[in-house]
């Protein structure tokens, strides 16, 4: 369950290291986000130098890993060791060219197929 002020690791090579959630998109009273949800976030840590994003930038990102377990349709549960997100362009494609770490299969249902194809492991 990702909410306002939650810290997320960045699972791509855009140069950002961590994000702070400003808002979970999808309704005026939406409080929590889960796997596959899009959030508006601020870059809190970034790699120094010429990276795609800088500290203080406001970006859109999709949640790809969450420590809160998510129930699947077959009755199993999936959870990860950290909360992570991938920074998006306005057309919902990833801004980076590489994805680090596993991502959830739920992203395929949410039409983030480009992230699925770049990920080294889909769980």
UniProtKB/Swiss-Prot annotation:
SUPFAM superfamilies: Ribosomal protein L14 (SSF50193). Keywords: Ribonucleoprotein, Ribosomal protein, RNA-binding, rRNA-binding. SMART domains: Ribosomal_L14 (SM01374). GO terms for biological process: translation. It comes from the Bacteria. One of its GO terms (cellular component) is cytosolic large ribosomal subunit. GO terms for molecular function: large ribosomal subunit rRNA binding; structural constituent of ribosome. PROSITE patterns: RIBOSOMAL_L14 (PS00049). The keyword Magnesium does not apply. Part of the 50S ribosomal subunit. Forms a cluster with proteins L3 and L19. In the 70S ribosome, L14 and L19 interact and together make contacts with the 16S rRNA in bridges B5 and B8. HAMAP family: Ribosomal_uL14 (MF_01367). Belongs to the universal ribosomal protein uL14 family. Binds to 23S rRNA. Forms part of two intersubunit bridges in the 70S ribosome. This is Large ribosomal subunit protein uL14. It comes from Tropheryma whipplei (strain Twist) (Whipple's bacillus). The gene is rplN.
């Amino acid at each position: 369950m990702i909410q306002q002020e939650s810290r997320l690791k960045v699972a791509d090579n855009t140069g950002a290291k961590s994000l702070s959630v400003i808002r979970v998109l999808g309704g005026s009273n939406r409080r929590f986000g889960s796997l596959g949800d899009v959030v508006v976030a601020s870059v809190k840590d970034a790699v120094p130098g010429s990276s795609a994003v800088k500290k203080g930038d406001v970006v859109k990102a999709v949640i790809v890993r969450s420590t809160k377990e998510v129930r699947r349709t077959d009755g199993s549960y999936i959870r990860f060791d950290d909360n992570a997100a991938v920074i998006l362009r306005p057309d919902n494609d990833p801004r980076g060219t590489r994805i680090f770490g596993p991502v959830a299969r739920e992203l395929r249902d949410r039409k983030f197929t480009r992230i699925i194809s770049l990920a080294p492991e889909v769980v």
